[in-house]
Design a protein with these regions (language model features):
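Beta-propeller folds
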Residues: 1-375
Length: 375
């Protein structure tokens, strides 16, 4: 509606349609990942929580928070036979446990029904860390990716730096060698912010999720040794796609908050999937698979929703060239471009009539701006 929110240094500003600019935050817990919700409030990430800010009066509401720890329990089960007997035979112990459990149940019920109480945090494996999170503009769901928390480098990832003020040689930490990188997997979760339910989104619906993509090479190597290779059908490690063109997670909500798509990649870089989330059944639904026996490009991966229709638009190189497609979930994609050229830098018009893009139609080294007519 023309309202703009932005951050500068330690402050967050909102510019209204009348031209007035108001600072709504300065210092304290930094606000980032700014976006507008369907009800006009400003949503922001603050530490390990998302909040919603009412721009008319400045009030804030916590939408969700998360912790990587064991969920606190009002009562713990007995650890052995002696503890079991103690808890079942001693009336005082039984009463104390009963009271703690009832108090905990009442507090959780109050948090669900009373907006005066902050929602209960979502708890994840304490050995994991956050890999990505995105909240629906409607404030009713969130998609979260977590991964095992482990160091990405060690003391050997160093490089000599010769130019120093003291004329000595300094050892600088650098990225690890490619050969030292270990496989990474993301667990994907759907959070229902209204009910507090947490559901894992399994990858079983992704075609090829357990393909042994190097089976031919491994079989050839085994044959040379006089051995036989048995095809491996274990699930591959899969993550949110890490693009060279954006830093936010590869999770895209439609602006109405009722549809969400994710872009996933296999750790071996042979497959990329665009999938939507069935919010009712809590499952992933594959919409497009891009496979490359060599390597899926880190470019040409733009994807998003049209503004006024739950229709995806995206880039794909499955023909060998990066081209532009639109697709209603569950239907076949429609190619908007084709030929021996590449399409990049997509921009959707606000009225959904055009997608502007850059392409080298006339010559591989000559890029010009074009538009695809969606009307």
């Amino acid at each position: 509606d023309g309202v703009i929110a932005y951050s500068f240094e330690d402050s967050v500003y909102v510019q209204f349609t009348n031209g007035e600019t108001v600072r709504i935050a300065r210092g304290g817990n930094a606000l980032s990942t700014l976006s507008f919700m369907t009800d006009g409030r400003l949503m922001a990430l603050s530490g390990n929580k998302f909040i919603a800010i009412d721009l008319s009066n400045g009030t804030r509401e916590e939408l969700l928070s998360w912790e990587f720890s064991d969920e606190p329990k009002a009562v713990e089960p007995p650890k052995d036979y002696i503890a079991e007997q103690q808890q079942s035979l001693v009336e005082y112990i039984k009463l104390q446990r009963k009271n703690r459990q009832e108090k905990d149940d009442a507090q959780k019920a109050l948090a669900k029904e009373n907006s005066s109480v902050a929602p209960t945090p979502f708890y994840f494996d304490k050995s994991h860390r956050l890999a990505g999170i995105s909240v629906s503009p409607a404030g009713n769901f969130a998609v979260v990716a977590t991964t095992e928390s482990k160091p990405t480098r060690d003391d050997s990832d160093i490089m000599p730096h010769y130019i120093q003020e003291d004329s000595r040689i300094a050892a600088k930490p650098v990225r690890q060698r490619v050969a030292d990188a270990e496989s990474v997997n993301h667990e994907l979760w759907l959070l229902n912010l209204k009910t507090g339910e947490k559901s894992e989104l399994k990858y079983f619906n992704l075609p090829g999720y357990n393909d042994d993509v190097l089976a031919d090479v491994k079989a050839e190597n085994a044959k040379a040794k006089g051995e036989t290779y048995e095809v491996n059908r274990l699930p591959r490690d899969i993550t949110l796609l890490q693009s060279w063109y954006w830093t936010k997670p590869s999770i895209r909500w439609h602006k109405n908050g009722n549809a969400v798509a994710v872009m996933l990649e296999a750790w071996d870089n042979k497959d990329r999937w665009i999938a939507t989330v069935d919010l009712a059944n809590k499952t992933l639904e594959n919409q497009h698979r891009l496979h490359d026996d060599a390597w899926v490009n880190y470019r040409f991966n733009a994807f998003d929703w049209l503004n006024d229709s739950e229709t995806l638009y995206y880039q794909s190189e499955h023909t060998g060239y990066s081209h532009l497609y639109v697709q209603k979930p569950g239907e076949k994609p429609v190619a908007l471009t084709s030929g021996r050229f590449i399409v990049d830098d997509l921009t959707l018009s606000s009225d959904d009539n055009y997608i502007y893009f850059k392409a080298n139609m006339e010559h591989p080294g000559l890029y010009e701006v074009y538009r695809a007519d969606l009307s």
